[in-house]
Amino acid sequence: MEDKKIAMEETIRSIFDFIGDDRHREGLLDTPKRVVKSWDKLYSGYTQDPREILGTVFEDGACDEMVVLKNIEFYSMCEHHMLPFFGKVSIGYIPDQKVVGISKLARLVEVFARRLQIQEKMTGQIADTLMEVLQPKGAMVVAEATHMCMVMRGVEKQQSVMVTSAVRGLFKRDARTREEFMGHIRH
């Protein structure tokens, strides 16, 4: 692994050359090491199994009413431009027999956000993993994010926010269930 890190540091130095900066100037000397180290966190989702995050479930005391965790902050990196996008995710599900600790829902968002990603796929992955592991009656995930590829390059629209949703099970079949969830996350 150390050889890969050294090779990546040299790649970062090559980027400095490509953009026309001086790889030997004081401010850039340790930048390659810092960038590679930051990737340990930024891309840590590749080293985690999202199903394991939801592995501890509780069956006693499981309810059959909607469970909602909203405004889960996240940061991710766009797979198209390797620029950040960030925002909030709200998750709702209706348990059948299993519930999970709420911190696990936030960790589930984190594991998918910490990968090269597109928001549409991330939103669906969160919902699909909930359905697979918890086997609820339904799940719904809404993500809202600002994409730096839209803000600092391209069309440069600073106020743009992308909204995606993934709707599964009862949420897909029943408009009232969707409306209840949307009511919870709007407040």
Swiss-Prot record:
**Catalyzed reactions per annotation:** GTP + H2O = 7,8-dihydroneopterin 3'-triphosphate + formate + H(+)
Q: Which GO terms describe its molecular function?
A: GTP binding; GTP cyclohydrolase I activity; zinc ion binding
Q: Which GO terms describe its cellular component?
A: cytoplasm
Can you name the source organism? Wolinella succinogenes (strain ATCC 29543 / DSM 1740 / CCUG 13145 / JCM 31913 / LMG 7466 / NCTC 11488 / FDC 602W)
Pathway per its UniProt entry is: Cofactor biosynthesis; 7,8-dihydroneopterin triphosphate biosynthesis; 7,8-dihydroneopterin triphosphate from GTP: step 1/1
Residues noted as binding Zn(2+) in the record, renumbered to the chain: 78, 81, 149
Q: Which InterPro entries match?
A: GTP-CH-I_C/QueF, GTP-CH-I_N, GTP_CycHdrlase_I, GTP_CycHdrlase_I_CS, GTP_CycHdrlase_I_dom
This protein is called: GTP cyclohydrolase 1
* Keyword GTP-binding on entry: yes
**Which terms are listed as keywords in the entry?**
GTP-binding, Hydrolase, Metal-binding, Nucleotide-binding, One-carbon metabolism, Zinc
Superkingdom: Bacteria
The main enzyme category here is hydrolase
What the record says about family reads: Belongs to the GTP cyclohydrolase I family.
Assembly information from the UniProt record: Toroid-shaped homodecamer, composed of two pentamers of five dimers.
Q: Which PANTHER family match?
A: GTP CYCLOHYDROLASE 1 (PTHR11109:SF7), GTP CYCLOHYDROLASE I (PTHR11109)
Sorted alphabetically, the Gene Ontology BP terms of this entry are: one-carbon metabolic process; tetrahydrobiopterin biosynthetic process; tetrahydrofolate biosynthetic process
The answer to keyword S-adenosyl-L-methionine applying to this record is: no
Please state the Enzyme Commission number of this protein: 3.5.4.16
